[in-house]
Amino acid sequence: MTTTSAFMLNVRLDNVAVVAIDVPGEKVNTLKAEFAAQVRAILKQIRENKALQGVVFISAKADNFIAGADINMIGHCQNAQEAETLARQGQQLMAEIQALPVPVIAAIHGACLGGGLEMALACHRRICTDDVKTVLGLPEVQLGLLPGSGGTQRLPRLVGVSTALDMILTGKQLRARQALKAGLVDDVVPQTILLEAAVELAKKERLAQRTLPVRERILAGPLGRALLFRLVRKKTAQKTQGNYPATERIIDVIETGLAQGSSSGYDAEARAFGELAMTPQSQALRAIFFASTEVKKDPGSDAPPGPLNSVGILGGGLMGGGIAWVTACKGGLPVRIKDINTQGINHALKYSWDLLETKVRRRHIKASERDKQLALISGSTDYRGFSHRDLVIEAVFEDLPLKQQMVAEVEQNCAAHTIFASNTSSLPIGDIAANAARPEQVIGLHFFSPVEKMPLVEVIPHASTSAQTIATTVKLAKKQGKTPIVVSDKAGFYVNRILAPYINEAIRMLTEGERVEHIDAALVKFGFPVGPIQLLDEVGIDTGTKIIPVLEAAYGERFSAPANVVASILNDDRKGRKNGRGFYLYGEKGRKSKKQVDPAIYKLIGVQGQSRLSAQQVAERCVMLMLNEAARCFDEKVIRSARDGDIGAVFGIGFPPFLGGPFRYMDALGPGEMVATLQRLAALYGPRYAPCEQLVRMAERREHFWTNGETDQGN
């Protein structure tokens, strides 16, 4: 047996070499440049052992194969040439694995992503477990990159060009059965027999060649390929709005390899990787990745968390049902739901059933796993079953006396250590805790809708909240699969506070005569997933505008919205998607009809609907108000750091990830440019655009929010 720091070679008695991958001191395996020499030493031993029948690569980690290449390697590259060299080194190593003279099998359990899948693709066959943790994909596009170690060339030849383009352009991850159907793996087996199944496959002298499906064979021909690439380019441009250069390069590189051969394809891949690594988009996306990783490690406070064995939820509505699902099905914690009637409890239970049943239908989980997770959720119309709950989340109506009553009832019916967490989106946590016997155990935990999809939560301590309460709540959020940021107990907290002026300005432009679709298209072009008017429809016009008076009372006229317009829309029973009537027309099932704006909206608010502003002007007016408010939040310590502010905006409202978040974007523009732009807009549109003191100070001192890759605290 020969041991290296990350790889261990063991030649079995049946002459099959097993290479175990185990990066020391790390929970997950990642590929690093320094491992190349270690792998080559093992490959040399394999080539020299003429008695070997086959090779199996397998992870020694409990639940991952290889999660990807170490992204820090890219950050160390000073220029495109160095990044290109890094890619070529990876390509060469994979080529050496593929060139081994005996069958080489990748035995995959857990995450097999990025460079990990590229290594598996270099093997002659792949076999994986049927475990829910097993996923395969090439997510490099999400970092503004493309697979740089041969993935763009091997994957299309293995699964077909159409499937490969879909996987690489989206970064989607396939589960075991999906990977088998696509031809990405050759077999799916229980984890208990993974190694032996891989060994048996390695012993086969001749491995049968897989035939691509008819559709993929047609698309592989010159005519089919030309049509496919033309269509993919068009659809990709529509989706990315030209904001993600990696997608264009991915298409070019794959097409080059298929049209001109693998050698040209590998060369194009390496060059594109090097160039993309230096783009501001990739740098911003990688910064978001590292920031989110840091946030997930942040305990929230220095105190150790308290016990967290079970959770209670008050309210079985849309939010309560979603919170129950992430707590039980993501966090694995028993959940007890209390509602004033059984209808609410049944709604919450059905919410989880529907989500889990969808997973069963898609073969992501088994029916037995669905039943196991559902068994964690129970309900009642009183506080039976609440006495031992460690934390209770309130998800009732936005009514202060009602929430204060909930605090009193929880303190009366639950344990002395039970934490009360309010899912309020607008009410001050200090006011909710005003009459509490144990105010140190009251905290805000603001989820975003739909709970099962939105990754962010805001954790909001008030002045008396204890450090342990913060730590316990942050721990729960992480168990729920969320990315938590701790924010101050000020009106609107962080996300809603920066979102409100952005939406207000969109409504204001609507009253000036700008068309709904023009406003939305301008912000989508800027990089948001949906425009502000459509977002208001999705959230619910009644819900989305409810916070405006709260913010206006706290911060003054800059948060005022055209009240008559909002009132006219609400009085016409327009709530958005949820009741089928908003700014857009909706079908019976709540689906938009080609995003068709309801023309009656213009008459309702008394305008003609004729756009005069350019898309750039529309986007500038909305975005600059958001940025200015984000800078105020930094100054007032509403957020703890620029890092948290960027994560909150990207994960909470879809701020364009390729810009890195509002604070990285402001740093890229420069505080001087920010102040000048805001002053110009203030002269045109009024004092709501006046640059905040934080930006003026930073412009004078030539400071930035981020310093040397670290977070800057508010001053």
UniProtKB/Swiss-Prot annotation:
Keyword tags: Cytoplasm, Fatty acid metabolism, Isomerase, Lipid degradation, Lipid metabolism, Lyase, Multifunctional enzyme, NAD, Oxidoreductase
Region called Enoyl-CoA hydratase, residue ranges: 1-190
Highest taxon of the source?
Bacteria
Q: Provide the E.C. number(s) assigned to this enzyme.
A: 4.2.1.17, 5.1.2.3, 1.1.1.35
Q: Which organism is it from?
A: Salmonella paratyphi B (strain ATCC BAA-1250 / SPB7)
Pathway stated in the Swiss-Prot or TrEMBL entry:
Lipid metabolism; fatty acid beta-oxidation
Renumbered to this chain, region (3-hydroxyacyl-CoA dehydrogenase) spans: 306-715
- Where this protein primarily resides, as one coarse class? cytoplasm
Q: Check the record and name the PROSITE patterns matching this protein.
A: 3HCDH
Q: Per its database record, what is this protein's job?
A: Catalyzes the formation of a hydroxyacyl-CoA by addition of water on enoyl-CoA. Also exhibits 3-hydroxyacyl-CoA epimerase and 3-hydroxyacyl-CoA dehydrogenase activities.
For this entry, the protein name equals Fatty acid oxidation complex subunit alpha
Q: Name one GO cellular component term.
A: cytoplasm
Please list the GO biological process terms of this entry: fatty acid beta-oxidation
So what does this thing catalyse? a (3S)-3-hydroxyacyl-CoA = a (2E)-enoyl-CoA + H2O; a 4-saturated-(3S)-3-hydroxyacyl-CoA = a (3E)-enoyl-CoA + H2O; a (3S)-3-hydroxyacyl-CoA + NAD(+) = a 3-oxoacyl-CoA + NADH + H(+); (3S)-3-hydroxybutanoyl-CoA = (3R)-3-hydroxybutanoyl-CoA
NCBIfam families this protein is in?
FadJ (TIGR02440), PRK11154.1 (NF008363)
Keyword Nucleus on entry: no
**Site feature location: Important for catalytic activity:** E118, E140
Q: Note whether Nuclease occurs among the keywords.
A: no
Cite the source lineage.
Answer: Bacteria, Pseudomonadati, Pseudomonadota, Gammaproteobacteria, Enterobacterales
Matching entries from InterPro entries are given as: 3-OHacyl-CoA_DH_CS, 3-OHacyl-CoA_DH_NAD-bd, 3HC_DH_C, 6-PGluconate_DH-like_C_sf, ClpP/crotonase-like_dom_sf, Enoyl-CoA_hydra/iso, FA_oxidation_alpha_subunit, FadJ
Q: Where in the cell is it found?
A: Cytoplasm
Assembly description: Heterotetramer of two alpha chains (FadJ) and two beta chains (FadI).
One example of the protein's molecular function in GO is: NAD+ binding
